[in-house]
Amino acid sequence: MRVLIKNGTVVNADGQAKQDLLIESGIVRQLGNNISPQLPYEEIDATGCYVFPGGVDVHTHFNIDVGIARSCDDFFTGTRAAACGGTTTIIDHMGFGPNGCRLRHQLEVYRGYAAHKAVIDYSFHGVIQHINHAILDEIPMMVEEGLSSFKLYLTYQYKLNDDEVLQALRRLHESGALTTVHPENDAAIASKRAEFIAAGLTAPRYHALSRPLECEAEAIARMINLAQIAGNAPLYIVHLSNGLGLDYLRLARANHQPVWVETCPQYLLLDERSYDTEDGMKFILSPPLRNVREQDKLWCGISDGAIDVVATDHCTFSMAQRLQISKGDFSRCPNGLPGVENRMQLLFSSGVMTGRITPERFVELTSAMPARLFGLWPQKGLLAPGSDGDVVIIDPRQSQQIQHRHLHDNADYSPWEGFTCQGAIVRTLSRGETIFCDGTFTGKAGRGRFLRRKPFVPPVL
């Protein structure tokens, strides 16, 4: 199968050019002008449009069971939504398994979830929920099998203490893996939450007040120091929501420490006032939404290069689940927001079209740097001969208002309802196959492939 994309502006992280793009058998074969492929081929006219590498979302939670509820997106509905939003690869954060389970247990469970369902290519981050000799011995074998990143938690049921974190950092570093971490100070959060509950203060606003930015920033600073103690182990901070944490990361990077950080559209575009609305419970996520001042600090990091990746932390629970389980108490509400379908459009509209970032920086944040950090480059995140034919075409002339009824996940609401975006996803191709076109999903369940990722190699800081 041959596909020729003509008359568009092809953009990579290192530059852009008005040129044509030829995909053959799922692989990019040629870029240039006046390409004359062998017949037969499909021709796509991208006049006036940007032709970007397909998005790489390295933070999703499909099929996750958090004990009190299971997310309403599985690997079909979740990856369908991703495809319709221009994302062609996801790396899913596996949820916790049974107490005492091995790393391989969760990998087998999640491969079972995704097989025959995923629409786009996918991989997983391992999750380390406890430390013992068997787990430490298992890590190198998992890296050899293509899992080159693992997540630690400093909060929730399977939080690790400092000694366990150090053991994990050392072994992951030795094994060629990248440590990712959810950084929040669990003890401080528990104390604040208990105070509010004892006082009968259980409205959504108290979720944010029980998890102040200092809880997140302290944990970020602690992880940076522990990574240094562990032999300058590489570290990736997920879902950054505040400027103080970013300051600590800037300092670490100035000291040549290998640290990277992601943020999410919700921390750039939503703020804590959402908790005071009638539907405040729909915005319960951790870390919580912050104030507009923190948004501005994150946008500075997006613009000046201090933030490396924009992912989603897509974790969907319906409003029915939230209301039934929480009964008006923030501490009982399952955490997470949908957003895998909106990431690319929101960042393009609020970043590129406002002049905050260039189209090249857009590629770096949404596909190139995620692919490089997580062992997928240059197969993903790049449009060059030999790379996968993963493409998203965005028309900057079109304006769209986000409406839940037009989205493709399995949620019953969207936190982005009513947002007007300048720029529309008009087509998504995965390995040369059109899986979304002009508002219609055209992919098939099970066509996505499991990606064995390469060991971690740090990009140049």
From Swiss-Prot:
Cofactor: how and how many bound: Binds 2 divalent metal cations per subunit.
Reactions performed catalytically: D-5-phenylhydantoin + H2O = N-carbamoyl-D-phenylglycine + H(+)
GO MF annotation: an example: hydrolase activity, acting on carbon-nitrogen (but not peptide) bonds, in cyclic amides
Residues that hold a divalent metal cation 1 according to the record: H59, H61, K151, D313
GO annotations of cellular component type: cytosol
Stored CDD domains: D-HYD
Class in the EC hierarchy, top level: hydrolase
Pfam families, A to Z: Amidohydro_1
Enzyme Commission number: 3.5.2.-
GO BP of this protein: pyrimidine nucleobase catabolic process
Residues that hold a divalent metal cation 2 according to the record: K151, H182, H239
Modified residues (N6-carboxylysine): K151
Coiled coil: none
UniProt: substrate binding residues: Y156, S286, N335
Protein keywords: Hydrolase, Metal-binding
PTM (free text): Carboxylation allows a single lysine to coordinate two divalent metal cations.
Swiss-Prot/TrEMBL cofactor(s): a divalent metal cation
Subunit structure and binding partners: Homotetramer.
Biological role: Catalyzes the stereospecific hydrolysis of the cyclic amide bond of D-hydantoin derivatives with an aromatic side chains at the 5'-position. Has no activity on dihydropyrimidines. The physiological function is unknown.
Family assignment from sequence similarity: Belongs to the metallo-dependent hydrolases superfamily. Hydantoinase/dihydropyrimidinase family.
Stated name of the protein: D-phenylhydantoinase
UniProt organism field: Escherichia coli O139:H28 (strain E24377A / ETEC)
Record gene name: hyuA
